[in-house]
Amino acid sequence: MAKSEAPINLTNQFLIAMPGMADPTFSGSVVYLCEHNERGALGLVINRPIDIDMATLFDKIDLKLEIQPVAHQPVYFGGPVQTERGFVLHDPVGIYVSSLAVPGGLEMTTSKDVLEAVANGSGPHRFLLTLGYSGWGAGQLEDELSRNGWLTVQADPEIIFSVPPEERFSAAIRLLGIDITMLSGEAGHA
């Protein structure tokens, strides 16, 4: 009788795309996993700013941005699912209509009230706004991991909020203590 493997839980971890990632959507990406369970996984790409800043987005959704320091912060590509919808990753500050508390410290909010709070200065000071999210069905992420598609490491909020986006990939790799140039995109087989 085969021993069943305990399910893995990668919530509050970074997924780091392996060199040679065939999918251009995720090549060179770092994904913060907000949720991972037997039904699948949900995460946000944290290192892919798009050509829109907070001021422009707030204009489009008719919100008056009263706090100028955030006006020129970039909006990010969070993933290929629901790209017309905003997802805010932030420190657990405030109570919002639709928030997912990520075990380990951060929250992901999808309701407009968090943007209203950011706009008037009463919201979280550390946040990352994405359009879209990254999603995997049951067993899909585990399959990609078994095929050498991703590296995983415990997430560090400082990388999300304090490191420039173009340096987040290498900063996440450094958490593993490895040299990315020494990795092959091919899995070895005996």
Curated annotation (Swiss-Prot):
Protein name: UPF0301 protein Reut_A0705
One Pfam family of this chain: DUF179
Cellular-component GO terms for this entry: cytosol
NCBIfam families: PRK00228.1-1, PRK00228.1-2
Species of provenance: Cupriavidus pinatubonensis (strain JMP 134 / LMG 1197)
Family: Belongs to the UPF0301 (AlgH) family.
Gene3D superfamilies the record matches: VC0467-like (3.40.1740.10)
